């Protein structure tokens, strides 16, 4: 004998929500909410941010509570069965629950209109009596509808309160509390207090009164605001740091290029000028060696060594500049495309400057035209840095405020990997130059 499949018992919450009276009322409220959002753009952006926050915390809560719900599934099924039986009896006593709100109002209006027409056609001389009859019918109809709605609200409210008061919901609430607390701790750990928040904390006076713990919604809103603000400040500080490093490298490259030009222009004019150029280049070499951790001041002071060392400085600085440009690009994801194109073009120009010095063994192999174009590219890079920084200071990228903070994580990670590889090659170049000289 073939077994008969038994449909699973529907959830009481699902049945209550699917009642025509409840669902139609919800549709009316939803349409009013959407209409209000469309009419007021500023209110729409705030509502969308709140919806995203609620979706996030709901997802975290459901993930945390899922193991608990699975353990209590038999008890939940029994409670759901009793609740469904009670809802069946309520639906039998109140057929109005299975009618949408628009139909209830239309039926009431139809009954009133029919009564009015019948009285008007049969009793033309008793207007006052007809009016009082119509008023009584309307009051009774309105009272019946109101009473049905109140009973429905009472049933739904009682069912919700019963569910919320159950041990299962208490465990779910505890899971939400733990998830929210852990999220707050993670924000404090990975996104430290900003200077403004530190000043506010310093101005607070510690008291002995107990502070009431805020609700979930207040804590969720505070956490969202705190996360956006601190993430923006951290991203901005990274960009400022990249700009500062780039400007320092550009300044050092300017000085190195000027020294090379000076040596090239005066190498055949007079021995004294040659000696002056060599002295300046040697001092630049010593200063750069000290900046990277070496203090070998007893090295040879001959012209050939000075030239090779100066070219090594130029190669190292251009590699640093390329790395810094990749770091800057990885930290400005989400800004307009023209700003990202400027940052990418800076990396291209840094690569062009590096190609000028990469294979040069002496100053003779670096032409005046290449030095002139390198100086022009360095000046353009400095201007592009100023433009990017001015934009970020005066125009906060929207995704830095409402998330995600790194919408192109793959590109960002690739840029950082390229920067790390260039750092490694730069260090190897430094070691090889040190061993050679």
UniProtKB/Swiss-Prot annotation:
One Gene Ontology cellular component: endoplasmic reticulum
A biological process from GO: long-chain fatty acid transport
Pfam family, one: Perilipin
Membrane topology: Peripheral membrane protein
Positions carrying Phosphotyrosine: 232
InterPro entries, alphabetized: Perilipin
Biased amino acid composition, Basic and acidic residues: 421-437
UniProt protein name: Perilipin-2
Protein family: Belongs to the perilipin family.
Cellular compartments annotated: Membrane; Lipid droplet
Keyword Nucleus attributed: no
Positions of region (Disordered): 412-437
Modified residues (N-acetylalanine): 2
High-level lineage: Eukaryota, Metazoa, Chordata, Craniata, Vertebrata
Superkingdom: Eukaryota
Tissues/organs with expression: Milk lipid globules.
Subunit structure of this chain's protein: Interacts with IRGC.
Gene3D superfamilies tied to this protein: Flagellar protein FliS (1.20.120.340), Perilipin, alpha-beta domain (3.30.720.170)
Post-translational modification: Acylated; primarily with C14, C16 and C18 fatty acids. Phosphorylation at Tyr-232 by isoform 1 of CHKA (CHKalpha2) promotes dissociation from lipid droplets: dissociation is followed by recruitment of autophagosome machinery to lipid droplets and subsequent lipid droplet lipolysis.
Function: Structural component of lipid droplets, which is required for the formation and maintenance of lipid storage droplets.
Residue numbers bearing the Phosphoserine modification: 215
Keywords, in A-Z order: Acetylation, Lipid droplet, Lipoprotein, Membrane, Phosphoprotein, Ubl conjugation
């Amino acid at each position: 004998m073939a077994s008969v499949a038994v449909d699973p018992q529907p959830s009481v919450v699902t049945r209550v929500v699917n009642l025509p009276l409840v669902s139609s009322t919800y549709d009316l409220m939803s349409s009013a909410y959407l209409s209000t959002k469309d009419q007021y753009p500023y209110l729409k952006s705030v509502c969308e941010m709140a919806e995203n926050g609620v979706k996030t915390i709901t997802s975290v809560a459901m993930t945390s509570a899922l193991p608990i719900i699975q353990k209590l599934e038999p008890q939940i099924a029994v409670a759901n069965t009793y609740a469904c039986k009670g809802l069946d009896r309520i639906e039998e006593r109140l057929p109005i629950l299975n009618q949408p709100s628009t139909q209830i109002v239309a039926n009431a209006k139809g009954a009133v209109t029919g009564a009015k027409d019948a009285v008007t056609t049969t009793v033309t001389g008793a207007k006052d009596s007809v009016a009082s009859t119509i008023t009584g019918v309307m009051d009774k109809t309105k009272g019946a509808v109101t009473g049905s709605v109140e009973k429905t609200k009472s049933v739904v409210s009682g069912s919700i309160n019963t569910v919320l008061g159950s041990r299962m919901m208490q465990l779910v609430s505890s899971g939400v509390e733990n998830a929210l607390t852990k999220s707050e701790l993670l924000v404090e750990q990975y996104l430290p207090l900003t200077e403004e928040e530190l000043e506010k904390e310093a101005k607070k006076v510690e008291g002995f009164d107990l502070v009431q713990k805020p609700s979930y919604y207040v804590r969720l809103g505070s956490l969202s605001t705190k996360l956006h603000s601190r993430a923006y400040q951290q991203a901005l500080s990274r960009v400022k740091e990249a700009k500062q490093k780039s400007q320092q490298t550009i300044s050092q490259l300017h000085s190195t290029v000027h020294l090379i030009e000076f040596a090239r222009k005066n190498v055949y004019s007079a021995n004294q000028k040659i000696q002056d150029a060599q002295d300046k280049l040697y001092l630049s070499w010593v200063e750069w060696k000290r900046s990277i951790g070496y203090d070998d001041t007893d090295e040879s002071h001959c012209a050939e060594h000075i030239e090779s060392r100066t070219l090594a400085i130029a190669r190292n600085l251009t590699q640093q500049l390329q790395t810094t440009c990749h770091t800057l690009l990885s930290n400005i994801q989400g800004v307009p495309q023209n700003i990202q194109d400027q940052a990418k073009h800076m990396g291209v120009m840094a690569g062009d400057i590096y190609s000028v010095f990469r294979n040069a063994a002496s100053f003779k192999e670096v032409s005046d035209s290449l030095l002139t174009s390198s100086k022009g590219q360095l000046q353009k890079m400095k201007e592009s840095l100023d433009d990017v920084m001015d934009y970020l200071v005066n125009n906060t990228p929207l995704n830095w405020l409402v998330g995600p903070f790194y919408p192109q994580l793959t590109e960002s990670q690739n840029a950082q990997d390229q920067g790390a590889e260039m750092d490694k090659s730069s260090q190897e170049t430094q070691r090889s130059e040190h061993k050679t000289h």
